């Protein structure tokens, strides 16, 4: 037994070492996008991040910032790496216990080694899975600490309690579970999901213990409802347990009657009053503590219950950080939980609105496939599946739905997925209790979350991280499936070498997985978020303010200001938060202040979300506040009190767009509309002399292929292209076509596959008289973008200009084939044929178009007259704006 324990410990240590090395090699060197910027900044300054405040993570992060190692963001990012590596090691140990339970006590030496191989494979497949690896190398509170580490520790403690309980009844591991769950709520609620599996396990093994621990475990499930509902749950569950012990004579009946009266008062205050009063809170507390104290003096069960209640309170006490720190007004103080009402609102996440199971915000098909299965299937690709996906897209476009369905099968991850199913079936047959334990964990972290979270079909970002616990549980089943397959091979095969070969092949899966996902999970050299924030702040006027939209144009800026002390004179005004009263008060009162001339009562009214404007129409609070702030900035002087800006990522401009002048990544708001839409000097200086592009572009301005950029980073980076495009069109309007072409060519180097840039560049070549360059560009574009109808249309138009009508028609026909509603292709074909005297063929295209679009007045007029010239796009039109990122 000692040798087995030593072997398991050594293998677990090896798992930790290997995984930690990989994570530290691929660790993000600076601030990433999304929540990481906020968490790094809050850890550094002891701030309060977005609801529910995650106080324990901030405190742990603050300790990490004090370690003299590399930079502050690397220290916080390393927290995720360390805890994720520990999680992988614990996953191996849990998997080993589960496989041993499946084999039974009478397993032989080969089965013991099979258990090690299965557990090791499952743990490493978790470590190098898509979502787990991605969150392990960035400052992320949800996954590494608050969910995966806490959950696998709780899962292990539950198994440890079960193992010890069979020898001698004990409550120690369960009491530790209570503390771990309740303290980890200060990081994320994910740890609380383990309450259900623990209830299932304890109820199966020992019903008396289940009744004893029902209060701390069940109460954990209502934590998202806030303090009052939690208090109500504690009162109800405790009262029910006290009644049981009263009937057994362990609690005085009169004490129970008094406790029941107090419990009724407490429940009414918890569930029906808007806030606790001091009196009702005291009565509710007494209704629980007095009977519990009496019970603790008379029985072991009472002492266990009292200790569990104490551990709940101690664990949850990390939330006391929130009002204490909020009262000191840190620079980042989301929700400002300095009062009871605001603290409760923060813990209940009222800022995000009420969450309901029904009605569903999207169809079940969307929620199951797009918001779950799409993420689940991409966790364990053993080889790149891009070729299969592209082939499936071609089959679907060609109407071959059968082959498209075949391509939709997750071939790259098929082996791990099938092994997980096999492991689940094998565990269900061999040990029903362990199956229900792991299965309930998987169920609540997949189906339960789908029901609870109720995602819409337009989520602002990939939500794969919410289901990380489900992937985790499934990896345990994959490990079981590996052990089952090796054992079955051993049982059925005559040759001893066959199960060895199978074991080696299965154990190699994590290596193939790591190889497949290495590039997309290697953050070395990735400074995109850091430099994007720097580039937005650097050119701003002193003591100005900038309106931003969501996480990715706000949190990195907060990081730059609070951690690197860069441009702290600038106030970042987040439009999403500008709908809340506490944020408006902070903008008014905390430096650097924003011009706001409203008292507290007026601001509280604005906090309701809508306000009537001058015409009596209701508008959103943030729209009202933007106008109020800008108007307050220009009162009493010919110049701005503070210069306002809008980030280019802001989609709604509140009517100020005519007064915008582009300056790099921001729009400067002018006092009138006379300044023009572009400041060429400022923008050019910013683009060429100020901005940093590490990880985005190489020294020659071309796209850096060595650093992976996800869809969000790639989309945000196109705002640099937008600035260059505006410069190019500015030069064209000034008659400086050569400089305009130079700008366009620079953008083409920056984004070689961005058709919204390449097509206008071809137009610039045409205007410059360089038809050969335009033809070469468009021909290459049709090869690189074979499904883009605009590429074929542009190529056809250029061929027609050259006089190659028949070849031009082939391009127009291809554009029509790709997009039957693309009117420009029809008109282009008509124009070419009509100009070359082929009127009948020209009218054929118009008839074809009118058949499908009878309401097109221009086409009908051409059809009736038999002649005419259609509209023709010109490169002198306004430049197309690159797609803007979808920010929350």
What kind of feature is each model-predicted range?
Residues 733, 767-768, 801-802, 835, ...:
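Register position in tetratricopeptide repeats
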Residues 55, 59, 67-89, 93-94, ...:
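Loop-to-helix entry region of an early transmembrane alpha helix in multi-pass inner-membrane enzymes
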Residues 13, 78-108, 150-157, 418-423:
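Transmembrane-helix motifs of polytopic, lipid-linked glycan transferases
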Residues 27-39, 49-60, 74, 142, ...:
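Extracytoplasmic catalytic/substrate-binding loops of multi-pass membrane glycan-assembly enzymes
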Residues 724-727, 731, 743, 758-765, ...:
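TPR/Sel1-like alpha-solenoid repeat signature
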Residues 104, 132, 137-148, 160-176, ...:
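ER/secretory pathway lumenal C-terminal domains and tails of membrane proteins involved
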Residues 119-127, 181, 185:
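Short helix- or helix-capping micro-motifs
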Residues 817, 830-857:
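TPR/TPR-like (Sel1-like) alpha-helical repeat modules
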């Amino acid at each position: 037994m000692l040798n087995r324990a030593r072997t398991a410990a050594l293998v677990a240590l090896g798992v930790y070492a290997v995984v930690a090395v990989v994570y530290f090699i691929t660790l993000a060197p600076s601030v990433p996008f999304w929540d990481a910027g906020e968490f790094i900044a809050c850890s550094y300054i002891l701030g309060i991040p977005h609801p529910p405040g995650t106080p324990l993570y901030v405190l742990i992060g603050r300790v990490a910032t004090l370690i003299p190692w590399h930079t502050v963001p690397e220290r916080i990012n390393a927290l995720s790496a360390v805890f994720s590596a520990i999680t992988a090691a614990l996953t191996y140990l849990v998997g080993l216990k589960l496989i041993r339970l499946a084999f039974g006590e009478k397993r032989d030496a080969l089965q013991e080694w099979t258990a090690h191989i299965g557990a090791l494979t499952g743990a490493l497949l978790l470590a190098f899975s898509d979502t787990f690896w991605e969150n392990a190398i960035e400052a992320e509170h949800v996954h590494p600490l608050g969910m995966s580490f806490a959950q696998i520790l709780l899962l292990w403690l539950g198994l440890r309690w079960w193992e010890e309980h069979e020898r001698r009844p004990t409550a120690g591991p369960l009491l530790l579970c209570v503390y771990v769950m309740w303290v980890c709520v200060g990081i994320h609620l994910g740890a609380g999901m383990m309450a259900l599996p623990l209830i299932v396990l304890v109820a199966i093994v020992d019903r008396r213990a289940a009744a004893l621990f029902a209060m701390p475990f069940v109460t954990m499930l209502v934590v998202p409802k806030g303090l009052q509902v939690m208090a109500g749950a504690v009162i109800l569950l405790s009262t029910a347990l006290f009644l049981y012990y009263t009937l057994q004579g362990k609690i005085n009946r009169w004490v129970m009657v008094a406790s029941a009266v107090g419990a009724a008062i407490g429940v009414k205050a918890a569930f029906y009053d808007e806030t606790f009063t001091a009196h009702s809170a005291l009565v509710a507390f007494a209704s629980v503590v007095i009977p519990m104290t009496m019970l603790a003096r008379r029985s072991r069960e009472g002492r266990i219950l009292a200790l569990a209640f104490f551990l709940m309170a101690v664990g949850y006490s990390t939330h006391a950080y929130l009002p204490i720190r909020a009262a000191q007004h840190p620079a980042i103080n989301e929700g400002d939980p300095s009062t009871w009402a605001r603290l409760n609102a923060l813990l209940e996440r009222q800022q995000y609105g009420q969450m309901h199971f029904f009605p569903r915000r999207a169809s079940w098909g969307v929620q199951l496939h797009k918001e779950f299965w799409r993420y689940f299937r991409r966790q364990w690709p053993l080889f790149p599946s891009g070729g299969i996906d592209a082939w499936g897209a071609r089959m679907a476009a060609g109407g071959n739905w059968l082959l498209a369905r075949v391509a939709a099968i997750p071939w790259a991850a098929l082996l791990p997925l099938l092994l997980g199913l096999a492991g689940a079936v094998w565990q269900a047959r061999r040990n029903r209790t362990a199956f229900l334990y792991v299965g309930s964990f998987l169920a609540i972290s997949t189906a339960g979350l789908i029901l609870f979270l109720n995602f819409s079909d337009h989520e602002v970002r990939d939500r794969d991280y919410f289901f990380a616990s489900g992937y985790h549980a499934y990896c345990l089943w994959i490990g079981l499936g590996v052990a089952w397959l090796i054992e079955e091979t051993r049982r059925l095969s005559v040759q001893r070498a066959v199960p060895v070969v199978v074991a080696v092949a299965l154990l190699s899966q994590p290596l193939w997985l790591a190889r497949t996902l290495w590039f997309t999970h290697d953050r070395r050299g990735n400074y995109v978020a850091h430099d994007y924030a720097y580039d937005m702040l650097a050119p701003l006027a002193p003591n100005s303010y900038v309106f931003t939209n969501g996480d990715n144009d706000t949190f990195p800026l907060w990081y730059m200001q609070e951690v690197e002390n860069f441009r702290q004179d600038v106030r970042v005004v987040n439009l999403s938060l500008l709908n809340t009263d506490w944020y408006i008060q902070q903008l008014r009162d905390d430096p650097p202040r924003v011009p706001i001339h409203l008292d507290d009562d007026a601001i509280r009214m604005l906090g309701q979300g809508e306000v009537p404007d001058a015409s009596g129409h209701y508008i959103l609070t943030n729209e009202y506040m933007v106008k109020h702030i800008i108007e307050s900035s220009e009162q009493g002087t010919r110049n701005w009190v503070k210069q306002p800006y809008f980030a280019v990522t802001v989609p709604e401009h509140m009517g100020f767009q005519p007064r915008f002048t582009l300056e790099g990544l921001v729009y400067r708001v002018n006092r009138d509309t006379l300044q023009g839409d572009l400041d060429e000097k400022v923008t050019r200086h910013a683009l060429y002399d100020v901005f940093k592009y590490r990880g985005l572009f190489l020294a020659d301005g071309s796209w850096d292929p060595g650093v992976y950029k996800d869809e969000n980073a790639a989309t945000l980076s196109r705002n640099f292209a937008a600035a260059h495009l505006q410069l190019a069109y500015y030069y064209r309007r000034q008659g400086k076509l050569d400089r305009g072409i130079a700008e366009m060519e620079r953008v083409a180097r920056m984004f070689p596959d961005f058709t919204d840039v390449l097509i206008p560049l071809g137009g610039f070549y045409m205007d410059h008289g360089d038809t050969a360059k335009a033809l070469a560009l468009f021909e290459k574009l049709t090869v690189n973008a074979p499904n883009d109808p605009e590429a074929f249309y542009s190529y056809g138009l250029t061929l027609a200009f050259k006089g190659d009508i028949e070849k031009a028609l082939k391009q127009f026909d291809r554009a029509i084939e790709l997009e039957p509603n693309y009117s420009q292709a029809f008109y282009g074909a008509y124009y070419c044929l009509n100009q070359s005297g082929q009127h009948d063929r020209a009218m054929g295209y118009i008839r074809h178009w009118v058949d499908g679009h009878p309401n097109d007045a221009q086409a009908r007029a051409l059809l009736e007259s038999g002649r005419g010239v259609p509209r023709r796009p010109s490169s002198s039109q306004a430049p197309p704006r690159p797609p803007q990122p979808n920010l929350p």
